[in-house]
Regions:
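Transmembrane signal-anchor helices characteristic of membrane glycosylation enzymes that use polyprenol
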Residues: 11-28, 42-57, 75-103, 115, ...
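Extracytoplasmic catalytic/substrate-binding loops of multi-pass membrane glycan-assembly enzymes
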Residues: 95-110, 117-134, 144-148
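Short acidic/glycine- and proline-prone juxtamembrane loop motifs at membrane-interface regions
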Residues: 103, 191-201
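Loop-to-helix entry region of an early transmembrane alpha helix in multi-pass inner-membrane enzymes
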Residues: 125, 140-163
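Transmembrane-helix signature of polytopic, membrane-embedded enzymes
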Residues: 165-186
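Membrane-interface transmembrane helices that cradle and orient dolichyl/undecaprenyl
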Residues: 170-173, 209-224
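Membrane-interface alpha helices of multi-pass inner-membrane proteins
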Residues: 187-188, 192, 207, 222-238, ...
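Membrane-lumen/periplasm interface segments of specific transmembrane helices
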Residues: 246-250, 262-333, 357-361, 501
C-alpha cells in the first residue's frame, strides 16, 4: 500500500498558506481577501464546521455506518447524483439569500432591472439570451424581484456544476462523498460569479469530456465525442483551450493505438510548470504582484521593495496555493516510480489536463504575475479538482490514511469555498468590510467600487452610488464610470458637471478610429432619452432640452437625440421650428423620414386625444417637408378640430401656401 505522506504534507502546506491568508485578509490571494468582510460569527461557523468534519473523519466507523444506511436505498446512480446536486442547490440559494450581492452579479442584476436593455448585449463573455428570457419568465411566475430570480438561477447554475462534477467523479472511480466536497466548492464558485455564464456550461462540458476520455481509454475504444466536447467548451469560454493538450494526447492515442509514456508526459508537464513559476516570480519580483499583497508602489520604483519579507512571503503564498495540487501529483509520480511501474493512460491524460491550465493561470496576465480575471482563473483552476481526485483514486488510501488526510482536504476546500458563497446575514457590516477591503488595495479597487455603485444604484441611493464611482475614477479612468456619474449629475440637474462627464466618455470612445462593441454600449443614448422624456413630463421642456443636448454630445453620429428634440417641439405646437429640425435630420439621415412617418401614423390611431393631435401635427410637418401641401392641410385640419381651434396650430395652418 502506497503511503499518503507526500499528499498529506502538501495539503498541510496548503493549510499553512491559507491560514496566512486568513491572518492577513487584505492579501488578494485567490478569494481569501473576501474573508475580511465576513462577520465574526461566520468565521466561527467555518471553524465549527471544519472541526466537525475533522472529528467525524477520525472515527471512520461513523461514516461507514452512515454510508451503509445510504447504500440500503437502491437508487440509480444518476438519480442519486441529481438528488445530491439539488440539495447543494438548496444550500446555494440559502447562502445567496443571506449575503449582499457585491460581485459581478450585481452589475448583471442592474442590467436585468432595465426592461429596455438589449438582451444580446448582456454582461459576460457570451451570455445566452435564452437565459435572460428565463429571468423575465420566472419573475411573474414566482413573484420574485430581480435579485430573487437572480439568486434562483445562480443556484441552478451551481446545481448544474455539481451534477456534472459528480458524473465525472464516478467515471474517475471516486466515491460520492469525496467528490461532493469538490463539487460543492465548484458550484460555490459558479454561484459567486453570479450570472449563469457560459463558463459554468463550459465546466459541465469539460466534466463530460474527461469522463468519456477516462472510460474510453479503459475500454480501449476511441470516442469522437471527446474532441467535439473540447471544441464546444472552448466556444463557450476560450480558457478551455488549455485542456486541449490532454485532448491532443488522447486523439494521438486513438489514432496510433500506442500507449502514452510516463517519462515524456512527466518531463513535458514539469518543464511547462517550471517555466510558469519562473514567469510568475520574475514578473512579481520586478513589478509587484498587485493581485496579491499591494504593499509596494507600482512602476520603476517597485524593485526597491523586493526584499521585504512580506513581499517574498506573498510570492510563496500565491505560488504554493496555485501549484500545491501539482506538487502532490509530482509526489505521487515519484512514489509510483519507486515501484517501477508505468502510470495508466488515463492518469497521464489527467496530468496534462492539470498542468497546462495551471501554467496558463500563472502566465495569463504576466505583467501582474498572476491571472487577474477571476472568471478566467475559475475556469483554469477547474483542472485542480480533476487531477487531485484522480490522484486520490490512484492511491486507494486505507481508512487510517483517509482519516488523517480528509480533515486537511476538507478544511482547505471549505476555506476556498466559503469566501465565495459566503454566510453573511448582516448586510451593513458586509458593506462596511467590503469598503474597508477596497481601501486596503487602492490601486486595484476600481472594479470593487463599480460593484458597490451598482449595489447602491439598485437600492436607489444616488448619493452613495455617485460616491462609489468618484472613488472608482481615482483609480481607473474607465469611461463607464464617467457615464454613470453623468447619469447622476443629470438626475440632480447639474448640467455643467454632466457635460464634463459626457465629454470624457465621448473622448474615450472616439480616441481612435475603431469603435468596439463595448464602446458602442457606452454611447447608447437611450437611457438619456428616457430621462429627457421624464423631465418633459415632470418639469417642462427646459430640462428635457438640456438632456437631449447632452445625448447629442454623447453620440454626435446618432440621429436619435435630434429626433427626440424635434418630437418634443411638435408636442409644444411650435410646428415651424419642428419642421426646420426635421428637415435637417432628414438631410443627414434619410431613413429617419420613414421612421418619423411610421411613428406619427401610430399616434393618430391611439385613443388619447393629445396623442392623436401630436400625430397629426407631426404628419403635417413631415408632409410639408415632402412637398405634400394637401396632406399637410388635411392633417392640420384634423389636429385643429381635435384641439378645439388651438391658436398655434391655426397659425401654422395659415402659414401654409393655399
Amino acid at each position: 500500500m502506497q503511503t499518503l505522506a507526500p499528499f498529506r504534507a502538501c495539503f498541510a502546506v496548503l493549510a499553512t498558506v491559507v491560514t496566512f491568508g486568513v491572518l492577513f485578509p487584505h492579501a488578494r490571494t485567490w478569494g481569501f481577501h473576501f474573508l475580511a468582510y465576513y462577520s465574526f460569527e461566520s468565521r466561527l461557523l467555518l471553524a465549527g464546521a471544519a472541526a466537525l468534519l475533522a472529528w467525524l473523519s477520525l472515527w471512520p466507523s461513523w461514516i461507514a455506518a452512515a454510508a451503509a444506511r445510504i447504500r440500503q436505498v437502491q437508487l440509480h446512480p444518476l438519480l442519486f447524483d441529481a438528488i445530491l446536486a439539488l440539495l447543494c442547490g438548496v444550500a446555494f440559494y440559502v447562502f445567496a439569500s443571506a449575503m449582499p450581492l457585491l460581485g459581478d452579479g450585481q452589475l448583471w442584476i442592474d442590467e436585468l432591472s432595465n426592461p429596455d436593455a438589449d438582451i444580446w448585449g448582456r454582461r459576460g463573455p457570451l451570455t445566452l439570451a435564452a437565459l435572460d428570457q428565463l429571468h423575465y419568465a420566472l419573475r411573474p411566475l414566482t413573484g420574485m424581484d430581480v435579485p430573487g430570480v437572480f439568486r434562483l438561477t445562480s443556484a441552478l447554475s451551481g446545481v448544474v456544476a455539481v451534477l456534472a462534477w459528480l458524473r465525472f467523479a464516478r467515471a474517475a472511480g471516486v466515491k460520492p462523498l469525496a467528490a461532493l466536497l469538490w463539487g460543492f466548492a465548484w458550484g460555490g464558485v459558479a454561484l459567486f460569479f453570479g450570472y449563469v455564464e457560459l463558463y459554468v456550461l463550459m465546466a459541465g462540458a469539460l466534466s463530460v469530456m474527461l469522463a468519456l476520455m477516462l472510460i474510453s481509454v479503459r475500454r480501449g475504444k476511441f470516442s469522437l465525442w471527446v474532441p467535439l466536447l473540447a471544441v464546444l467548451a472552448a466556444a463557450l469560454n476560450y480558457a478551455a483551450v488549455t485542456f486541449w493538450p490532454a485532448v491532443a494526447a488522447y486523439v494521438a492515442w486513438g489514432v496510433s493505438k500506442r500507449p502514452l509514456k510516463t517519462k515524456g508526459v512527466f518531463f513535458t508537464a514539469g518543464g511547462l510548470m517550471v517555466a510558469a513559476a519562473g514567469a510568475y516570480f520574475v514578473t512579481g519580483w520586478h513589478r509587484g504582484t498587485s493581485v496579491l499583497l499591494p504593499l509596494w508602489s507600482s512602476g520603476a520604483s517597485a524593485s526597491s521593495y523586493v526584499f521585504q519579507p512580506r513581499h517574498l512571503a506573498d510570492l510563496a503564498n500565491g505560488l504554493v496555493l496555485a501549484c500545491g495540487p501539482f506538487f502532490a501529483l509530482l509526489c505521487g509520480q515519484l512514489a509510483a516510480r519507486r515501484d517501477r511501474r508505468e502510470w495508466s493512460g488515463e492518469r497521464l491524460l489527467l496530468t496534462l489536463a492539470l498542468v497546462f491550465p495551471l501554467a496558463a493561470y500563472l502566465m495569463h496576465n504576466s505583467h501582474l504575475g498572476m491571472a487577474r480575471d477571476w472568471d478566467i482563473g475559475c475556469a483554469l483552476l477547474l483542472a485542480v479538482p480533476f487531477a487531485s481526485l484522480s490522484l486520490w483514486s490512484e492511491w486507494q488510501p486505507s481508512p487510517r490514511e483517509r482519516a488523517a488526510a480528509l480533515p486537511l482536504v476538507a478544511a482547505w476546500l471549505m476555506l476556498v469555498t466559503i469566501p465565495w458563497i459566503g454566510v453573511q446575514a448582516c448586510e451593513a457590516r458586509a458593506l462596511t468590510r467590503f469598503t474597508h477591503v477596497l481601501r486596503l488595495d487602492p490601486e486595484r479597487s476600481a472594479s470593487g467600487w463599480d460593484y458597490l455603485g451598482a449595489f447602491y444604484r439598485l437600492r436607489n441611493e444616488p448619493d452613495q452610488w455617485a460616491r462609489c464611482y468618484e472613488e472608482a475614477l481615482k483609480h481607473s479612468d474607465n469611461p463607464r464610470f464617467h457615464y454613470n456619474l453623468a447619469i447622476y449629475h443629470i438626475s440632480r440637474r447639474e448640467w455643467e458637471q454632466a457635460l464634463g462627464q459626457i465629454n470624457a466618455v465621448r473622448d474615450a470612445v472616439y480616441a481612435d478610429s475603431v469603435v468596439t462593441g463595448w464602446e458602442t454600449r457606452l454611447i447608447d443614448t437611450r437611457q438619456l432619452l428616457e430621462m429627457g422624456r421624464a423631465y418633459e413630463n415632470l418639469s417642462g421642456t427646459a430640462d428635457a432640452s438640456m438632456v437631449y443636448r447632452l445625448a447629442s454630445q454623447l453620440d454626435p453620429n446618432s440621429s436619435l437625440p435630434p429626433v427626440a428634440m424635434a418630437e418634443m417641439v411638435v408636442r409644444t405646437r411650435d410646428l415651424t421650428r419642428a419642421e426646420e429640425m426635421f428637415r435637417m435630420i432628414f438631410a443627414r439621415d434619410a431613413a429617419q423620414e420613414s421612421e418619423a412617418k411610421r411613428f406619427y401614423v401610430s399616434l393618430v390611431q391611439e385613443p388619447s386625444v393629445a396623442r392623436r393631435i401630436e400625430g397629426y401635427c407631426g404628419l403635417a410637418a413631415v408632409a410639408r417637408i415632402e412637398g405634400d401641401a394637401a396632406g399637410a392641410h388635411e392633417s392640420l385640419s384634423h389636429a385643429l378640430s381635435l384641439s378645439h381651434d388651438d391658436s398655434l396650430i391655426a397659425a401654422y395652418l395659415a402659414s401654409l401656401p393655399q
